[in-house]
């Protein structure tokens, strides 16, 4: 059974505190937009789809609380301004993740249109917001399962031409249930392969410096009893070079895909794409359409978040033998005191290194001109 990282029911929101994983599984309450902002900024929740969902739901919880307390204005214009201000605030928690900005824009548009509707009130606006927020959670899970099915089919069709019924896959960072409403994007593809008895082995990278692969992806893989092996980031080249490894594909997620296919994802993704190209391994990006930013022409325009030097120079975990005791978490220094640190959270993989982008509407490959064209994905009249 897949993990449930986000629990939302009866206008109550809880998330797994991912800072404590894999040692302690604890759900923490999110009671306001401010709580949501801090959870995202502090990486208690991460993964582009999950960030957007938690942000939107955190405001839903706050609006519900205001309404229950009898403090909600009857004016839809006044409530609308409050919601829009909170949405803008939430976007500042993680500027690289396009899903968050995209969700905020959509909800802002919904709010603006609702306030112009005849008979609109503060109460009706909040009701509309809550309904859309809940649908967002449902749709993300459905989209992820479609991504998984499309991606698994694409990989297996190509593996079959080489006589392979089962495949080995490499993934980076965490793109599973912990990064989404459930099931996952890139890890959803791997999960679909496993469910179809077509996964021989998945390799997951440690994903320095924040160790999302070692802490989170490995946690999910062990939880679901998938055949899995953890490697450090620097071992990927050696893995691909081993004839017996037979890695069919590298599948990663995305925080933002530019209009030309350039993809911002966790630092280290670009290096894996270069390795894949050299070794003739398919390199795939798995992401919902909300991650595709058609307003950003290329990766050159993507803002890359830089994080604290301490994430590189220190590491946090429990003392060996005391796993499970949250009070025994220790921070250990790894690097020489005084060394300068550069710590970008993401890098941009050029579209030229990406073989395909897997979405909930299907797999997009480059056209005859050698470029990605995503417009058809957004044509609601076209079939999936």
From Swiss-Prot:
Gene Ontology BP term (one): L-methionine salvage from methylthioadenosine
NCBIfam families (UniProt xref): eIF-2B_rel, PRK05720.1, salvage_mtnA
Taxonomic placement: Eukaryota, Fungi, Dikarya, Ascomycota, Pezizomycotina
Protein's job: Catalyzes the interconversion of methylthioribose-1-phosphate (MTR-1-P) into methylthioribulose-1-phosphate (MTRu-1-P).
Record family assignment: Belongs to the eIF-2B alpha/beta/delta subunits family. MtnA subfamily.
Keywords per UniProt: Amino-acid biosynthesis, Cytoplasm, Isomerase, Methionine biosynthesis, Nucleus
EC number: 5.3.1.23
Record's subcellular location: Cytoplasm; Nucleus
Catalysis performed (reactions): 5-(methylsulfanyl)-alpha-D-ribose 1-phosphate = 5-(methylsulfanyl)-D-ribulose 1-phosphate
GO molecular function: S-methyl-5-thioribose-1-phosphate isomerase activity
Class of the enzyme per the UniProt entry, highest EC level: isomerase
Residues the record marks as site: Transition state stabilizer: 173
TM region(s), chain numbering: none
Protein name listed in UniProt: Methylthioribose-1-phosphate isomerase
Superkingdom of this protein's organism: Eukaryota
GO cellular component: cytoplasm; nucleus
Signal peptide location: none
List of catalytic residues: 255
Pathway membership: Amino-acid biosynthesis; L-methionine biosynthesis via salvage pathway; L-methionine from S-methyl-5-thio-alpha-D-ribose 1-phosphate: step 1/6
Species this protein is from: Talaromyces marneffei (strain ATCC 18224 / CBS 334.59 / QM 7333) (Penicillium marneffei)
């Amino acid at each position: 059974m897949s993990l449930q990282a986000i629990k939302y029911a009866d206008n109550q929101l809880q998330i797994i505190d991912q800072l404590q994983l894999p040692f302690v599984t604890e759900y923490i309450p999110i009671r306001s937009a401010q709580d949501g902002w801090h959870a995202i900024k502090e990486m208690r929740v991460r993964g582009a789809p999950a960030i957007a969902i938690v942000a939107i739901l955190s405001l839903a919880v706050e609006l519900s609380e205001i309404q229950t307390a009898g403090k909600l204005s009857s004016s839809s214009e006044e409530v609308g301004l409050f919601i829009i201000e909170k949405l803008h605030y939430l976007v500042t928690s993680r500027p690289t993740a396009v899903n968050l900005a995209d969700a905020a824009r959509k909800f802002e548009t919904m709010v603006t249109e609702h306030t112009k509707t005849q008979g609109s009130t503060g109460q009706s606006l909040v009701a509309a917001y809550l309904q859309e927020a809940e649908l967002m959670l449902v749709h993300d899970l459905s989209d992820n399962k479609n991504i998984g099915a499309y991606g698994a089919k694409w990989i297996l069709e190509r593996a079959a031409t080489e006589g392979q019924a089962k495949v080995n896959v490499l993934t980076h960072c965490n793109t599973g249930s912990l990064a989404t409403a459930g099931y996952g994007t890139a890890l959803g593809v791997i999960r679909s392969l496993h469910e179809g008895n077509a996964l021989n082995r998945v390799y997951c990278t440690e994903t320095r410096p924040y160790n999302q692969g070692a802490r989170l992806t490995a946690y999910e893989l062990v939880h679901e009893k998938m055949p899995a092996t953890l490697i450090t980031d620097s071992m990927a080249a050696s893995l691909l070079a081993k004839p017996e490894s037979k890695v069919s594909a590298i599948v990663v997620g995305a925080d933002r895909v530019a209009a030309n296919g350039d993809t911002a994802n966790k630092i280290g993704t670009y290096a894996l794409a270069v390795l894949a190209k050299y070794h003739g391994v398919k390199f795939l990006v798995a992401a919902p359409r909300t991650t595709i930013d058609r307003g950003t022409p290329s990766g050159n325009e993507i803002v890359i978040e830089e994080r604290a030097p301490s994430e590189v120079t220190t590491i946090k975990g429990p003392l060996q033998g005391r796993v499970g005791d949250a009070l025994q978490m220790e921070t250990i220094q790894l690097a020489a005191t005084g060394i300068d640190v550069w710590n970008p959270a993401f890098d941009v993989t050029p579209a030229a290194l990406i073989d395909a982008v897997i979405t909930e509407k299907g797999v997009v490959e480059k056209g005859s001109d050698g470029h990605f064209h995503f417009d058809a994905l957004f044509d609601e009249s076209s079939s999936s």
